[in-house]
Amino acid sequence: MASSPHQQLLHHHSTEVSCDSSGDSNSVRVKINPKQLSSNTHPKHCKYSISSSCSSSGDSGGLPRRVGGGGRLRRQKKLPQLFERASSRWWDPKFDSMNLEEACLERCFPQTQRRFRYALFYVGFACLLWSIYFAVHMKSKVIVMVVPALCFLVVCVGFFLFTFTKLYARHYAWTSLALTLLVFALTLAAQFQVWTPLSGRVDSSNHTLTATPADTCLSQVGSFSICIEVLLLLYTVMQLPLYLSLFLGVVYSVLFETFGYHFRNEDCYPSPGPGALHWELLSRALLHVCIHAIGIHLFVMSQVRSRSTFLKVGQSIMHGKDLEVEKALKERMIHSVMPRIIADDLMKQGDEESENSVKRHATSSPKNRKKKSSIQKAPIAFRPFKMQQIEEVSILFADIVGFTKMSANKSAHALVGLLNDLFGRFDRLCEQTKCEKISTLGDCYYCVAGCPEPRADHAYCCIEMGLGMIKAIEQFCQEKKEMVNMRVGVHTGTVLCGILGMRRFKFDVWSNDVNLANLMEQLGVAGKVHISEATAKYLDDRYEMEDGRVIERLGQSVVADQLKGLKTYLISGQRAKESHCSCAEALLSGFEVIDDSRESSGPRGQGTASPGSVSDLAQTVKTFDNLKTCPSCGITFAPKSEAGAEGGTVQNGCQDEPKTSTKASGGPNSKTQNGLLSPPAEEKLTNSQTSLCEILQEKGRWAGVSLDQSALLPLRFKNIREKTDAHFVDVIKEDSLMKDYFFKPPINQFSLNFLDQELERSYRTSYQEEVIKNSPVKTFASATFSSLLDVFLSTTVFLILSITCFLKYGATATPPPPAALAVFGADLLLEVLSLIVSIRMVFFLEDVMTCTKWLLEWIAGWLPRHCIGAILVSLPALAVYSHITSEFETNIHVTMFTGSAVLVAVVHYCNFCQLSSWMRSSLATIVGAGLLLLLHISLCQDSSIVMSPLDSAQNFSAQRNPCNSSVLQDGRRPASLIGKELILTFFLLLLLVWFLNREFEVSYRLHYHGDVEADLHRTKIQSMRDQADWLLRNIIPYHVAEQLKVSQTYSKNHDSGGVIFASIVNFSEFYEENYEGGKECYRVLNELIGDFDELLSKPDYNSIEKIKTIGATYMAASGLNTAQCQEGGHPQEHLRILFEFAKEMMRVVDDFNNNMLWFNFKLRVGFNHGPLTAGVIGTTKLLYDIWGDTVNIASRMDTTGVECRIQVSEESYRVLSKMGYDFDYRGTVNVKGKGQMKTYLYPKCTDNGVVPQHQLSISPDIRVQVDGSIGRSPTDEIANLVPSVQYSDKASLGSDDSTQAKEARLSSKRSWREPVKAEERFPFGKAIEKDSCEDIGVEEASELSKLNVSKSV
């Protein structure tokens, strides 16, 4: 473990350390990135590989080996491991974890059982056919040959019935071993009856056999085919360890040849002579080597693919679980800031952006590239905009009275803590009273009921919420020893709800009724709920209601000008004589809401309630006895101690979700932090109002599992890996996919094609895509490396068969035929060339030239690969057939060997499992049928009656008559006897080849499908994470989210932060509710705010954070990310960027107005910088905001500013003027709370007093304009939140490099901004003329100005 100074050194040099472990070996890769000393210095990244540095065993010495530097990194040319997590024991392919190995054997058991039953069917069927054959052709030895075969058939039936028992599932390996030994015994016993003389004699001079018609027995080719079948079954379906299979196979081959040779020579087989005997023994041994090589290859690749498929399917299941968690976390995250209905529509936008991101990063193959259409899609007129009008909605505004006095003697950090505590109580009340929290504006809190989902009791919900807030603040004062109160206003009407902008969005409501609800709060009385006459109509007489007495308190002018005669009421509580239960009183009296859905569905994450004990039932009865129901809201309450809240904690006045136990936790209250056994997500996903802080912390725990594993010490790595494996096994055991996956593969049972046509096309192009992408080879299961092994085996078998064929000529001292030499040379060239190409594809593809790489990519295609594969898989058979000439008629040994070699060539068609099994099996059938045809073809050119060389060797009653006779003494043809045996022999062997080819292609396709499923789930998870990150970035800044993962709150003081307020000052003139309640007006505002948000996407403005939009006011700040400011160079560089952003906003409005045709928006910007506090407020509907005197002054710079110009304070002027900006001195302006302040305007007027052309007209009147959408000025919402801070200008920027600022330009205009007709631009039902709109706008503006009042503190 590195010491602390070493850790500091690594951190100082930005060193990245990763631990890569595979199997029993581990390695550490260290990446050192020295800090840049200057902007012109670009140090090269160096990577070093330190072997065995984190291995629990092995030497750790050795010098580091540099594997990359300034040049291109080269792929390590080494043999990959068998499969992921493979043990180091190559002779026994298994996982390095017993948990994984046992789970794999258990999950693959249906496939193992199925294959074993197929083997029993095959063996039993072979016994039946051989019994029939022996009964017909060996009547004199029925007992010797037929009875054992029939007895073994009965044994196979017994084994088959045994496979249905549970005992077989526990001892299937021992069952396979028992069957193997029985098959060995039966086939070796048959060797005693091979070539037994019946009624004939052997002519030793020419090695021919003359016999009279009699019974026949198995020939040498027939017995060797049985040996091949036994060995193939041993390696492919018996499921014994490799070392045991190899040992048994070698012993069987030795005994088989020993018994066969012994009894052939002892009874009737003539000795071929010393030289020929050595050739025969060596040739037979080499043929057995070929069979064992093919069997080992099939065994290893079968194990590799089954275990790789198990891991892939298991990973797919794990990814599926992770996908559920990610989806739940994403839903919780977005539902914590907005309602579900709005969130669903917003997520579609995130899905589209994620899909576009995937497409940008995807690598398409040439076949998948589609020709671009010449028809271009029509440009989208507007950005995605979701806003709906809802009637009968109650709106509540609440303001903390006395908050300014309370905050006067508190620090900013303490103030954020108080707001979190108080708003946390309000959030809980809002949740339980079924209200929808909208946001907080400074010390103001507002929510709605009946929106976005309508409710008939919306008025009661808001009244209960208001009364609960008054009760809650009383408790707050008692606990905190403070003197504050609540002033609440409620109004009922129609609202527009939705989201404005593309970044830092939040759910909000707009309408004149919202402004009126805000006015009700401002005209209310502390400690009471001030409601309008519209709200009172929805209430009954359960509340103590009195007249609002607005005239007596505020005067006649307020009622006449602002309320316009609207009658109001004050509610102080419920009537004492009524027995109604108040939600607020119940919540604040130690009761908790019982979720009906949770009760009906049982424990979280379960569909039915789990059975409990008698004590649990008694506790449930006791709980129901203490239930309370609020008649106004229909909400049921229970005491917190009885509502399942045990184990929860109270933070910020809000109780956490109860934690339930799971099997993996090991106890009712056990928890695993940052571990693999994190609580299931289903336990925490029922509450849509969960704190976003908890979501981020939970997301960090899930995401931190893999990070923690790579950084663990070597001594703990094994323990952590065991826990990971145990968790992996537990997850897949609960899923039925694994069992169905192997037992019911998603493929067509006849053609073996995938049922999904798109998946089939993808499968056929997968090999080519792997070559195109030059994917690294990690395991034997890789498609390119698997092909390399197939080509290597094909070359090996071809060379061995060719050598055995050429050995005969050395023994007989005869030259080989020219045709055989030519075929051998051509075949060898093809094999070597294929081997070189395969090695090139696997290890050296990045080094080939472009033309060669194109050729390799073409070869990797589906059709070329099958054509080349068909040739390669047939080369051994072609080599054997090239040696069949007329000479083989005269020698029994050569003829028998040739037939045996053809059998090996047929078995070789089990190679190349990536190719179609139909193609390989068909070619094997053709090769076998070719040998049978030789029985009817004479190689003698002078004879009209032909004779096969095998006929002369294998017919016991044939007498050699060279070139002119092939008829037996009794007149029968040779093929009439020996042909039937060979037909049966090749039929059984081809049947086994067809079966194995089918099984291994299915296995290969399942392995590919497992990869696809795992990648698909991994892509979905990544998409979910991208969406969550996208949401997170649009809710709170990224650096703030990282902090919230480890703490419940966030607040930070900044010494020099820049703040701007930009208001569309004449939006109230543009806004009118005559059509769709003003929805289309807000669509236009959404477009303009979206243009502002797009500016933030530019790299030049990445240091600017959008804070929020307040109606038609846009608020942004800079210098809030300390780490980013330190990397930027000068500490005040962010102020220049923020000022350039403000200038660019002016230009955006100018461009926007050029396309408006009939209305010009006017932007007014206020700029200031200085110390401020940034923090996150609330437990639900989190809001990232900034406070401080700097923010207050920036807001006043906006409200007291000039249209189409930027107003800055004197301190900001000093800094910006040194950066090269010219200002006009405005004079002194009366700023609320600050008195007279000197301000400056940008841009500077020209000599003739005219503002530059790109600016709009300047209004000489300085008017304080409040927000037209909610009736609150940006200054009012944040004024006096913190004690005044003495402002002083600090270090200024005096560099000469920035004497002339460069203005950013918009790169392109939006396509929808082309001049169009007014009726096309705004679909208000008819064309809107400028004059009529101006008339309507003036009337509406005058009405709005009467409703808007400044908030008094």
Swiss-Prot record:
Q: Where is this region: Disordered?
A: 1-27, 51-73, 349-375, 596-615, 641-685, 1290-1314
Tell me the compartments it is located in. Cell membrane
Q: What is its main location?
A: membrane
* Residues binding Mg(2+) 2, per UniProt: D399, I400, D443
Q: Which residues cross the membrane?
A: 118-138, 142-162, 172-192, 216-235, 242-259, 281-301, 787-807, 819-839, 868-888, 892-912, 921-941, 976-996
| Positions bearing carbohydrate | N206, N955, N964
PTM Phosphoserine: at which residues?
A: S610, S613, S688, S691, S706, S1257, S1259, S1295, S1307, S1332
Q: Which cofactor does it need?
A: Mg(2+); Mn(2+)
Q: Which residues lie on this side of the membrane: Extracellular?
A: 139-141, 193-215, 260-280, 808-818, 889-891, 942-975
Q: Which UniProt keywords apply?
A: ATP-binding, cAMP biosynthesis, Cell membrane, Glycoprotein, Lyase, Magnesium, Manganese, Membrane, Metal-binding, Nucleotide-binding, Phosphoprotein, Repeat, Transmembrane, Transmembrane helix
Output the InterPro entries linked to this UniProt entry: A/G_cyclase (IPR001054), A/G_cyclase_CS (IPR018297), Nucleotide_cyclase (IPR029787)
One GO cellular component term, please give it: axon
Top-level EC class as recorded in UniProt: lyase
Compositional bias (Basic residues) at which positions? 359-374
Pfam families associated with the record: Guanylate_cyc
Q: How does it sit in the membrane?
A: Multi-pass membrane protein
- EC number(s) in its UniProt entry? 4.6.1.1
Residue positions binding ATP: 399-404, 441-443, 487, 1108, 1185-1187, 1192-1196, 1232
Name the residue ranges with Low complexity bias. 51-66
The Gene Ontology biological process terms listed for this entry are: adenylate cyclase-activating adrenergic receptor signaling pathway; adenylate cyclase-activating G protein-coupled receptor signaling pathway; cAMP biosynthetic process; in utero embryonic development; intracellular signal transduction
Record comment regarding domains = The protein contains two modules with six transmembrane helices each; both are required for catalytic activity. Isolated N-terminal or C-terminal guanylate cyclase domains have no catalytic activity, but when they are brought together, enzyme activity is restored. The active site is at the interface of the two domains. Both contribute substrate-binding residues, but the catalytic metal ions are bound exclusively via the N-terminal guanylate cyclase domain.
Give the protein's recorded name. Adenylate cyclase type 9
Gene behind this protein: Adcy9
